[in-house]
UniProtKB/Swiss-Prot annotation:
Main location: endoplasmic reticulum
Family: Belongs to the fatty acid desaturase type 1 family.
Annotated protein name in UniProt: Acyl-CoA desaturase
UniProt keyword annotations, A-Z: Endoplasmic reticulum, Fatty acid biosynthesis, Fatty acid metabolism, Iron, Lipid biosynthesis, Lipid metabolism, Membrane, Metal-binding, Oxidoreductase, Stress response, Transmembrane, Transmembrane helix
Native source species: Cyprinus carpio (Common carp)
Length: 327
């Protein structure tokens, strides 16, 4: 696809790199670990959300067919707000997006309600730079529950806060879409995560307000949350490591399916700037094949970064666990 002029008002220049490469110089502080402080408000809210989601699952068979379609549409839209938006576009700058596409992804991100783009991207860059150390927000060394959801139920480790403050985030601060969403995040969440998913089926085709709230809003929200969390937990514990056997992130097919392409995690932590997050392009990778590649074809995205096949094979042979298809 031919390159577009940066001068065009819908295109914005992006920095070539971001701080998402593991920092081997970091050393955890000696001595006792700081006490774990439970945030009871978060515990209560997460518990209520999942109880509501279970009730939504019970109500799901009674929903109208249009509500099922709406449910899956909202699920995909909010998931893309994380995978194609907060993750691959804003955290890693692995491709460039036009202003309309940025706005679309920011709205999907608000529907996903997993912290605003700025905070999500900051924490994700810290996760990559200090993976599985005290400075990692969802350090998998602390166990499945902590890396899955527990990290959101307690105060952050002091090193997470310290390293997050020192991270270079000028690209995010200069991004008008990111900062606009951050400024109006709470009303955007109320609108996109709860009001729109509930109002549309109730008003447009007469779905029960009860079903409209518990199925497209709460159940959908909880499913996307847990799909994202599985990348932090399961994909750091179970699977093979064909590219770098010295790190914990794994290739996990179940996570790949549930998180629409985010389960090729050993590859992703080895080559974090690759827009596909996988050696295999479209295989089990809805975010890459059906969305980012389509956006590039339509001219709404451009310059997707990719690792050469030669570099991938060389790295797999040098540091992989021997499970790579090339042997």
């Amino acid at each position: 696809m031919p390159d577009r002029e940066i001068k065009s008002p819908i295109w914005h220049p992006e920095p070539g790199t971001v701080e998402d490469v593991f920092d081997h110089t970091y050393k955890e502080k000696e001595g006792p670990k700081p006490p774990t402080v439970i945030v009871w408000r978060n515990v209560i809210l997460m518990s209520l959300l999942h109880l509501g989601a279970l009730y939504g699952l019970f109500l799901f068979p009674s929903a109208r067919a249009l509500t099922w379609i709406w449910f899956f549409g909202c699920l995909l839209f909010s998931a893309l707000g994380i995978t194609a938006g907060a993750h691959r576009l804003w955290s890693h700058r692995s491709y460039k997006a036009s202003l309309p596409l940025q706005i679309f992804l920011a709205l999907g991100n608000s529907m996903a309600f997993q912290n605003d783009i700025y905070e999500w991207s900051r924490d994700h860059r810290v996760h990559h730079k200090y993976s599985e150390t005290d400075a990692d927000p969802h350090n998998a060394v602390r166990g499945f529950f902590f890396s899955h959801v527990g990290w959101l139920l307690v105060r952050k480790h002091p090193d997470v806060i310290e390293k997050g403050r020192k991270l270079e985030l000028s690209d995010l601060k200069a991004d008008k879409v990111v900062m606009f969403q951050r400024r109006f995040y709470k009303p955007s969440v109320l609108l996109m995560c709860f009001f729109v998913p509930t109002f549309v089926p109730w008003y447009v085709w007469g779905e029960s307000l009860w079903v409209a709230y518990f199925v497209p809003a709460l159940l959908r929200y909880a499913l996307v949350l847990n799909a994202t969390w599985l990348v932090n937990s399961a994909a750091h514990m179970w699977g093979n490591r064909p590219y770098d056997s010295s790190i914990n992130p794994r290739e996990n097919r179940f996570v790949t399916f549930s998180a629409i392409g985010e389960g090729f995690h050993n590859y992703h932590h080895t080559f974090p700037f690759d827009y596909a997050t996988s050696e295999f392009g479209c295989k089990l990778n809805l975010t890459t094949c059906c969305f980012i590649d389509l956006m590039c074809f339509l001219g709404l995205a451009r310059e997707p970064k990719r690792v050469s096949r030669e570099a991938v094979l060389a790295r797999a042979q040098r540091t992989g666990d021997g499970s790579h298809w090339s042997g």
